[in-house]
A protein has these predicted regions:
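Short, well-ordered strand-loop elements centered on a beta-strand within folded domains, enriched
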Residues: 1-4, 125-134, 189-194, 269
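Active-site microenvironments in enzyme catalytic cores
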Residues: 16-188
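Catalytic-pocket segment enriched in acidic/His residues
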Residues: 140-275
């Protein structure tokens, strides 16, 4: 739930508005609630029936990593150069981890990586209204074994993290000039770190949105992860106890501890709701 105009509403409600209507709500709220700090912890910026989708092989580094891991490398080279992008479903609201919440590596996977990504927050009218930080946790061993296993490598409980909030699109003048930094802490030390920029993104953001909405509808809006330009070198793999920190210019830092398997989540309640 999100405080707007002295009341609480869902983010899904806001994503049913047009971009102009949403700007008006944000401007009015900024005037009436200036200086009021949000109460309580930050939750994942997703709720209701809003879905998370993702684009793949949109950076050269991603294409190289997929070729490296796969027994059928040519399919990744072909999609990298094709007009049609790779788009796939990633998560529902209840499967998403928010800031500080654990992300999961599959218990039946031997090679797992975080994928730091710029995520587009898109309203029901296919307008980009905001941006957030995403972590598309993936099993390289499962996808590398057979590309048809991609849903198992990508779609499971807490394989996606979003946060720390949503930055309005009007506050990000050039989304193609954002530095993306990732650090993986292991035993309180940097186990891996790297940096890239959205300047390296091969696809245009509006093209990705157009393909996503071409034959689909999203009444509660949608969040679209735009692919990763950072992939840890072989044979690095995430381990339980690691912490992944992803920072994107103007959007903030998303940090999540790592657990192995859904059993590692225990009986933690889910904060993002889904009917």
């Amino acid at each position: 739930m999100w405080p707007f105009q002295a009341r609480f509403t869902t983010l899904a409600d806001l994503l049913r508005l047009s971009a102009d209507e949403l700007r008006g709500v944000i401007d009015e709220t900024s005037r009436t609630e200036a200086g009021q700090a949000p109460a309580g912890p930050y939750w994942a910026p997703i709720d209701g029936l809003t879905e998370v989708w993702a684009a793949g092989v949109t950076y050269q580094r991603s294409e190289e990593a997929r070729v490296e891991e796969s027994g059928t490398p040519d399919i990744y080279t072909r999609v990298y150069t094709a007009d049609r992008p790779e788009l796939f479903f990633k998560a529902t609201a209840r499967r998403v981890a928010g800031p500080g919440e654990p992300i999961v590596v599959r218990a039946d996977s031997s090679w797992d990586v975080p994928e730091p990504e710029l995520a587009l927050v898109i309203n029901a009218r296919a307008e980009i209204v905001g941006y957030t930080v995403a972590n598309d946790v993936s099993s390289r061993s499962i996808e590398g074994d057979n590309p048809l296993y991609l849903p198992q490598a990508k779609i499971y409980a807490r394989s996606c993290a979003l946060g720390p909030g949503v930055s309005p699109a009007s506050g990000v003048p050039d989304p193609y000039a954002l530095s993306i930094r990732m650090r993986i802490l292991r035993n309180e030390q940097a186990g891996w770190s790297g940096q890239t920029s959205t300047r390296e993104l091969k696809r245009r953001l509006d093209d990705l949105v157009e393909y996503l909405f071409r034959e689909d509808t999203f009444t509660d809006g949608v969040i679209l992860c735009t692919g990763t330009g950072l992939v840890p070198d072989t044979p690095f793999t995430l381990q339980a106890g690691d912490t992944v920190e992803i920072e994107i210019d103007q959007l903030g830092t998303l940090a999540n501890p790592v657990v192995r398997g859904k059993a590692g989540l225990g009986a933690r309640p889910k904060t993002s709701s889904e009917p």
